[in-house]
């Protein structure tokens, strides 16, 4: 397969994965590639692999999102995965939770640029929303060890709500280590899923913690 053919396959696969959010995700990627490094959102080495590693990869949790309702993306940073999910699912109310002012300023500009009417910004730590916000799902990508993340996020979930955490190679080990923390909550199931978005054997691990 030539380089051009490979690119076509990659684009078509991305379009299939992102669905109606594809065009907005392309624009998001352009903005992040142009401004992300100077604004301290991504490192210089991330720019060449931004599209697949960060933008498309954000869709790994999409299949477990609720059919309706609201989602909170905790520690969203540059908007990953929250902005991508908001683009893919305009029917959901997406709450982007980020304590750093400069990142929230970026997210506010992004919301306007991408016409994300379904996005609400919260410049707080997740713990500050306990008792104030209830959602059907929480997403998190490279935020904290699972035990700590569970204590921050599970109080935000409504009944039968789900935490979807994108993790690395230690996903199962983190889940095992978090057993003590999870006992304090009404957890129904907790499992690790290997997600191969592009069908190329490269997997992303998603930890799913669902409440009763």
UniProtKB/Swiss-Prot annotation:
Keywords from the UniProt entry: Cytoplasm, Methyltransferase, rRNA processing, S-adenosyl-L-methionine, Transferase
EC class name: transferase
Keyword Repeat: no
GO CC annotations, alphabetized: cytosol
Main location: cytoplasm
Binding site for S-adenosyl-L-methionine: 75, 80, 126-127, 141
Highest taxon above the source species: Bacteria
Enzyme Commission number(s) from the entry: 2.1.1.-
Gene Ontology MF terms: rRNA (guanine-N7-)-methyltransferase activity
Subcellular location: Cytoplasm
Coiled-coil ranges from the UniProt annotation: none
Gene3D superfamilies reported for this sequence: Vaccinia Virus protein VP39
Keyword NADP belongs to the record: no
Stored InterPro entries: rRNA_ssu_MeTfrase_G, SAM-dependent_MTases_sf
Family: Belongs to the methyltransferase superfamily. RNA methyltransferase RsmG family.
Functional note: Specifically methylates the N7 position of guanine in position 518 of 16S rRNA.
Protein name: Ribosomal RNA small subunit methyltransferase G
Lineage: Bacteria, Bacillati, Actinomycetota, Actinomycetes, Micrococcales
């Amino acid at each position: 397969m030539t380089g051009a053919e490979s690119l076509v396959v990659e684009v078509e696969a991305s379009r299939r994965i992102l669905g109606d959010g594809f065009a907005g995700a392309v624009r998001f990627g352009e903005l992040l590639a142009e401004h992300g490094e100077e604004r301290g959102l991504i490192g210089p080495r991330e720019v060449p692999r931004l599209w697949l590693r960060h933008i498309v990869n954000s869709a790994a949790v999409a299949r477990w999102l609720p059919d309706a309702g609201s989602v909170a993306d905790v520690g969203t940073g540059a908007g990953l995965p929250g902005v991508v999910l908001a683009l893919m699912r305009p029917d959901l109310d997406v709450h982007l939770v980020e304590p750093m002012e400069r990142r929230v300023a970026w997210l506010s500009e992004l919301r306007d640029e991408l016409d994300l009417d379904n996005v609400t910004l919260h410049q707080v730590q997740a713990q500050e929303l306990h008792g104030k916000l209830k959602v059907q799902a929480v997403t998190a990508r490279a935020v904290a060890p699972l035990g700590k993340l569970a204590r921050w996020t599970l109080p935000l979930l409504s009944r039968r709500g789900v935490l979807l955490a994108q993790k690395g190679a230690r996903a199962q080990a983190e889940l095992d280590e978090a057993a003590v923390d999870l006992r304090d909550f009404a957890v129904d199931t907790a499992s690790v899923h290997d997600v191969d978005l592009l069908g190329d054997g490269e997997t992303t691990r998603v930890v799913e913690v669902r409440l009763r």
